[in-house]
């Protein structure tokens, strides 16, 4: 619980519980430094973001939350409120891998609402995941990205990581209670394939300990892992298999024979230590593939996207190309200030921390693949997806771990003994997108022509996948859904077409409003013309009649009463109710064209209550350690 603040003590005094003197209050504040420093949501509010596109700023919060007071351990988060609500309120927590790689990769290069056009200009991400879900990016473990901890206090094991993450969530929900009832999905990629199942298990254990109504059980509704490092025992041997399938190495060649020797050594190490997460001898297979497939220009395969090449020995460490803009942007002083970065953190943002990676060896942790069966059997849906051009955490290893895993009374994607769930062809807007496979609460999606970072390559397709998994229903907000089909069948509308700054539904509504307005203006114009013609006719009649009268009564001054009454009636009609034809257009009809969900704020509590500045005008809602990368 949050510590008592002066304002809340005042409300207690009003209720007659206690009468505290000013002297006692001052002493309390003096000897309770944490009381004076307790933060509120307003302290995390992002009031501006350098380089953001024109228009209202998306609602966001960012900053540090302490998870280890003894060692000054703090986790950094960046939260975006969703742009629209479909049928339920959802929050997606996103984690990148490493270990020790910042989730700002996900925020600015994959699923976040913005991408960098250059190192000082942001543009909207066409396919961002914040369309129907709040996004919470967290730099973890401590020491990663903008997160920090005292030197020599980095953590080592997966259970330490998950315990600190639960502490983070407890404190985060205290700051932002309006989101605590959301459906929660934990998503990420690469080495986050180890983190996510451990966090999911810790959430379940935390929920099971709740005995009263003083705490809220968190609604964990699913986990999503892309190109995950989940089962090293399957992933290490898949390097050579993948290299054969993609034509990186020719089977039967002298190189292949040499690599098979390394493969044999690796398999013996796995047999001796089947639960090891990091095996040095197995990493040698990947290193040899990269080193011995260089071209004449010393260009090696990009281990994250084998369609590309990179200078040796980087072999993908310079990828993706957006990195050249992300790093200088996140190191800008004005950006650091805007994101409420603790000024005591002296070091600037780094994509991946070697210190975190080398310390987090998980030597005493079981690989997360062993947690998946229990999670599935407890009712937690799991989505595993892979880009087919990734080498380091390739789809061959993911498919092998699924085939070997037993859960809910079957092995792999068995639907009955010896019968396997079919692979369904997926097309997106008329183009082959990949395959879907499902059995007993587990979904697998293979993306065609995608790298280690699928949302980086295919943002809209990945959003479509997410919407389907979360069962987003856009029927109540209208709009034309994306043409996404499984085996040629267009399933329920779960994803909208892409638009840089809104949903296609909203754009369509705006176009419909504009069309209605023009029709109304045309009607009003026609009506006004008729009124003018009538008025001119009446006025002409009045002039003609007046002149006749003046000729008959030239000796008498008389104000023409008929003239006044006709003009008054004419002006009254102009200023009073519109004529029948113009009245057919009612501006309230325009309001009805807006679906209630499109322009509605997410939560009444969260709109401006967290911005306490009286001058604030809230915006309208409107080895390898790498990007999300794995260090096998």
Swiss-Prot record:
The chain crosses the membrane at residues 524-544. It catalyses: Preferential release of a C-terminal arginine or lysine residue. Residues 1-38 form the signal peptide. GO terms for molecular function: serine-type carboxypeptidase activity. Residues 492-506 have a biased composition (Polar residues). Residues 480-509, 574-632 are annotated as: Disordered. It is found in: Golgi apparatus, trans-Golgi network membrane. Residues 545-632 are cytoplasmic. Protease with a carboxypeptidase B-like function involved in the C-terminal processing of the lysine and arginine residues from protein precursors. Promotes cell fusion and is involved in the programmed cell death. This is Pheromone-processing carboxypeptidase kex1. The lineage of its organism: Eukaryota, Fungi, Dikarya, Ascomycota, Pezizomycotina. The gene is kex1.
């Amino acid at each position: 619980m949050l510590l008592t603040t002066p304002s809340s003590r005042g409300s207690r005094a009003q209720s007659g519980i206690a009468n505290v003197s000013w002297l006692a209050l001052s002493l309390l504040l003096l000897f309770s430094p944490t009381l004076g420093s307790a933060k509120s949501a307003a302290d995390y509010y992002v009031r501006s973001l350098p380089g953001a596109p024109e228009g209202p700023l998306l609602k966001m919060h960012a900053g540090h939350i302490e998870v280890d007071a003894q060692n000054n351990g703090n986790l950094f988060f960046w939260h975006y409120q969703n742009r629209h609500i479909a049928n339920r309120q959802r929050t997606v927590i996103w984690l990148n891998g490493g270990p020790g790689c910042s989730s700002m990769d996900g925020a600015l290069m994959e699923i976040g609402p913005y991408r960098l056009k250059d190192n000082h200009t942001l543009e909207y991400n066409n396919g961002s995941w914040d369309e129907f879900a709040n996004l919470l990016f967290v730099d973890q473990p401590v020491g990663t990205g903008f997160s920090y901890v005292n030197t020599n206090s980095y953590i080592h094991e997966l259970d330490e990581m998950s315990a600190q993450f639960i502490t983070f969530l407890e404190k985060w929900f205290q700051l932002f209670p309006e989101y605590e009832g959301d459906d929660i999905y934990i998503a990420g990629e690469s080495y986050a394939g180890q983190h996510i199942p451990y966090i999911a298990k810790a959430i379940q254990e935390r929920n099971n300990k709740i005995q009263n109504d003083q705490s809220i059980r968190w609604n964990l509704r699913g986990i999503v892992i892309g190109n995950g490092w989940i089962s090293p025992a399957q992933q290490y041997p898949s390097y050579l298999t993948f290299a054969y399938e993609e034509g990186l190495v020719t089977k039967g060649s002298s190189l292949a024979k040499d690599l098979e020797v390394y493969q044999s050594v690796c398999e013996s190490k796995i047999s001796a230590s089947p639960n090891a997460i990091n095996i040095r001898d197995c990493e040698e297979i990947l290193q040899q593939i990269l080193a011995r497939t260089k071209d004449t220009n010393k260009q090696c395969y990009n281990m994250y996207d084998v369609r590309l090449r990179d200078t040796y020995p980087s072999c993908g460490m310079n990828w993706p190309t957006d990195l050249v803009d992300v790093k200088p942007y996140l190191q800008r002083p004005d950006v650091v200030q805007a994101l409420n970065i603790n000024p005591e953190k002296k070091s600037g943002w780094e994509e991946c921390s070697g210190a975190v990676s080398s310390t987090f060896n998980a030597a005493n942790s079981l690989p997360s693949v062993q947690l998946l069966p229990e999670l599935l059997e407890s009712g937690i849906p799991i989505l595993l997806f892979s880009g087919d051009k990734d080498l380091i955490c390739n789809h061959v290893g993911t498919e092998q771990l699924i085939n070997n895993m037993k859960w809910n009374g079957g092995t792999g994607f068995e639907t009955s003994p010896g019968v396997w769930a079919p692979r369904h062809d997926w097309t997106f807007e008329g183009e082959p997108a990949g395959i879907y496979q499902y059995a007993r609460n587990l979904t697998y999606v293979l993306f065609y022509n995608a790298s280690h970072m699928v949302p980086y390559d295919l943002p809209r397709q990945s959003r479509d996948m997410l919407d389907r998994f979360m069962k987003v229903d856009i029927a109540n907000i209208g709009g034309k859904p994306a043409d996404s089909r499984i085996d040629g069948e267009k399933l329920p509308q779960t994803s909208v077409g892409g638009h840089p700054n809104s949903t296609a539904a909203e754009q369509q509504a705006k176009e419909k409003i504009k069309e209605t307005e023009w029709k109304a203006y045309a009607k009003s114009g026609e009506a006004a013309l008729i009124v003018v013609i009538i008025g001119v006719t009446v006025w002409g009649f009045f002039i003609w009649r007046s002149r006749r009268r003046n000729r008959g009564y030239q000796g008498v001054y008389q104000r023409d009463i008929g003239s006044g009454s006709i003009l008054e009636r004419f002006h009254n009609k102009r200023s009073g109710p519109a004529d029948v034809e113009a009245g057919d257009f009612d501006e309230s009809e325009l309001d009805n064209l807006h679906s209630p969900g499109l322009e509605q704020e997410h939560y009444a509590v969260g709109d401006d209550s967290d911005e306490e500045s009286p001058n604030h005008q809230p915006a309208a809602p409107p080895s390898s350690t790498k990007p999300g990368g794995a260090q096998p």
